[in-house]
Swiss-Prot record:
Remaining remarks: In A.calidoustus, the austinoid gene cluster lies on a contiguous DNA region, while clusters from E.nidulans and P.brasilianum are split in their respective genomes. Genetic rearrangements provoked variability among the clusters and E.nidulans produces the least number of austionoid derivatives with the end products austinol and dehydroaustinol, while P.brasilianum can produce until acetoxydehydroaustin, and A.calidoustus produces the highest number of identified derivatives.
Pathway annotation: Secondary metabolite biosynthesis; terpenoid biosynthesis
UniProt-recorded name of the protein: FAD-binding monooxygenase ausC
Lineage: Eukaryota, Fungi, Dikarya, Ascomycota, Pezizomycotina
Region (Disordered): 1-20
Organism for this UniProt entry: Penicillium brasilianum
């Protein structure tokens, strides 16, 4: 089906909309047939793929300095162990400290990386930036008194900010790095969590077992912990350079994250597989530095304007900080109002970017109007108009009509993560850049010299995998995402709870896994600004723990806390009542947002119900936070079971 790229402006007719919807479905069917569910390789469980998991940033000298301190930390029994030292783990630690009931010395953070930052530690590819405004994304700006350098911060600056937070709250010496947690086991007799895994030496292959004991454990390892490597046929037949964007190899490419002049690629034929939010930042850099660049694309990205610019100190002080203490949270809430498409929007759009001009993204993250029966029908024309502008932008910026056609996205805006960049599309005007559209046949196989796609062998010096992260569809629990076996009372595992009918209290704790807290989207709030959602989890868990400690009698040394059965089932009913808010995702092109095209209608009724229990809070992040704050204000810890032991 051929439709004009300018189709569907403000005056679009019903017939035109039907044509576009038919085009959307046509593209969806093409991709379902060519891909369906892609099998990924578990890189941490496959010796042949360990190269994709190794840490290229850990300095041997740094490992030596930390070894003795970490041995001491491992020997002691700890009050709280947090798994993950990215922003999630840091926010849990900071909010606990701010209650006044816990000190930094009560907390240990454990991470497989060699430093703070989480995904911002691992990702250091050229062009890396965050596409959520830095003034709302970088947490604790008021507390650290830091002004971001640009509206959209570089990955380097964000990682430095994680280190800044750790230093301010005395957490720098409370982390055990290069440590892979493999299991959490509840010891019923001692009422503690036994945390076990391996400590990595200078060489990742040198592994020593470790064990920690903790009264409380918090899982904050994040959703982007493991690079996704598709199981392409004969991938290891390839004799050239092969690496993942999350483990960028500057030794091969030349340059650095501070200076992405990649002199090592000057005479190289380079391929990048994938055109998601990562690739659109890398492609302009590779285009400038490679002799030839081949971009392998299955689904075109919908790329809007980013419009980054340096922070003006005077404006930052007068306009952004101008309304006094609490400015960052108010700005975050303002941003959420637009992205969740609240019925009554604020009079001023403080962030004023591409995200806040996309009310249809509320179909994915939920919003106050999401449960209304006609909401999808009402929001669809608005989204179609936006997508039409995105398609027009492609043809305006890309000189070749054929290439522009291949780069044109035909799907609802909420189906694939929106992208924002000012150089990506123009890169395809360069004579050394070739787009390879693989949406019909995909990549057939790798060869010693390159790979085969669409029946053509491409001889390549280097292949870069921009294929994202493993987001398990059937292992959606925090333990499944992190590859950690979590076993609670009576042998109940976290995986079983998620698979067999999840119930939580507020999306942060679940029965039979006592003294364990977690971050995630299942039965919790979702929003564009991930650090805001993580912070709300952290604030809530800190409240529950600190209030429980206040209630602990002085003659009791042990506290065991978990939801009541009634409490977590009541919360789950609230989730189920709002699950229909996400119904718009069902007809999307395959991707991690919809289980790579999983057809829920083919599941048995009980399986569909179990999936619905995994949903986020369907009425938007503001409604979720209101529910938590209302619960906290009552002061009763309703739905929480506390046991005090001498």
């Amino acid at each position: 089906m051929t439709i004009s790229t300018t189709t569907l402006g403000s005056g679009a007719t019903t017939a035109t909309r039907k044509e576009v919807e038919a085009k959307y479905e046509e593209e969806r069917q093409i991709q379902l047939q060519s891909r369906g569910m892609v099998q990924d390789i578990e890189i941490t469980r496959n010796a042949s793929f360990e190269q994709f998991a190794k840490d290229p940033w850990a300095a041997p000298k740094q490992v030596d300095v930390e070894t003795q301190r970490e041995k001491l930390l491992q020997q002691a029994h700890h009050k709280i162990v947090i798994i993950g030292a990215g922003f999630g783990g840091l926010l849990f630690a900071v909010r606990l400290i701010q209650t006044g009931k816990f000190k930094a010395n009560d907390i240990i953070l454990v991470d497989s990386a060699a430093g703070f930052g989480g995904t911002w530690y691992w990702n250091r590819y050229p062009g890396l930036m965050c596409d959520t405004e830095s003034y709302i994304y970088m947490p604790l700006l008021e507390e650290t008194e830091y002004m971001p350098r640009n509206k959209y911060a570089s990955g380097n600056e964000i990682r430095e900010h994680a280190e800044r937070i750790a230093e301010k709250y005395n957490l720098s010496e409370r982390a055990i790095f290069r440590t892979v947690v493999q299991s959490l086991d509840w010891e019923e007799e001692e009422k503690v969590w036994k945390i076990a895994g391996v400590k990595l030496g200078k060489d990742d292959e040198c592994q020593q077992p470790f064990q920690l004991m903790a009264d409380f454990a918090i899982m904050a390892s994040g959703a982007f912990a493991s690079p996704r490597v598709p199981n392409y046929p004969n991938i290891f037949d390839y004799k050239g350079k092969l690496f993942h964007t999350a483990r960028w190899d500057y030794k091969y490419t030349g340059g650095s994250i501070e200076n992405p002049k990649m002199s090592g690629l000057t005479n190289k034929r380079v391929a990048i597989i994938g055109t998601g939010a990562t690739a659109i930042q890398i492609v302009p850099q590779l285009a400038r530095n490679s002799r030839e660049l081949f971009v392998f694309q299955r689904t075109p990205a919908a790329v809007d304007v980013r419009n980054n610019y340096p922070t003006d100190p005077a404006r930052f002080k007068s306009e952004i900080q101008g309304d006094g203490p609490g400015w960052q949270r108010r700005r975050q809430i303002n941003f959420n109002a637009f992205t969740c498409n609240e019925k009554t929007l604020p009079t001023d759009n403080k962030v004023g970017d591409g995200w806040t001009r996309m009310p249809s993204f509320s179909v994915l993250i939920g919003g106050p109007q999401s449960l209304e029966p006609d909401y999808i029908d009402e929001i669809r024309p608005i989204d179609m108009a936006r997508q039409s502008e995105i398609r027009s932008r492609v043809h305006k910026l890309v000189q070749s009509t054929a290439i522009a056609d291949s780069l044109t996205p035909w799907y609802p805006g909420w189906c694939k993560r929106p992208c924002f960049h000012d150089e990506y599309l123009q890169s395809f005007n360069s004579s050394n850049v070739q787009l390879v559209d693989i949406r019909h046949d995909g990549i057939s196989r790798f060869t010693p010299k390159g790979l085969v796609a669409n029946g053509v062998e491409y001889e390549l010096d280097a292949i870069i995998l921009s294929t994202g992260y493993t987001v398990p569809v059937t292992r959606a629990s925090p333990s499944g995402r992190a590859n950690i076996a979590v076993t609670g009372r009576r042998g109940v595992t976290m995986e079983e709870k998620w698979a067999n009918g999840l119930a939580t209290l507020h999306g942060v704790m679940t029965r039979d896994l006592p003294n364990l807290f977690f971050a995630g989207t299942s039965q919790a709030g979702a929003c564009v600004n991930l650090t805001y959602a993580l912070d709300q989890n952290a604030i809530h868990v800190a409240h529950i723990l600190s209030e429980a400690v206040k209630r602990q009698p002085s003659d009791c040394t042990k506290l065991v806390i978990q939801p009541t059965h009634e409490g977590e089932e009541a919360w789950t009913m609230e989730i189920l009542q709002r699950a229909a808010g996400f119904r718009g995702i069902a007809g999307c092109t395959p991707g991690y947002l919809n289980g790579y095209g999983m057809d829920a209608s083919s599941l048995k009724p009980e399986e569909q119900m179990n999936m619905a229990r995994l949903a986020a809070w369907g009425q938007g992040i503001a409604s979720y936070v209101d529910a938590l704050e209302g619960w906290r204000s009552e002061g009763q810890l309703e739905g929480v079971e506390m046991t005090f032991l001498a």
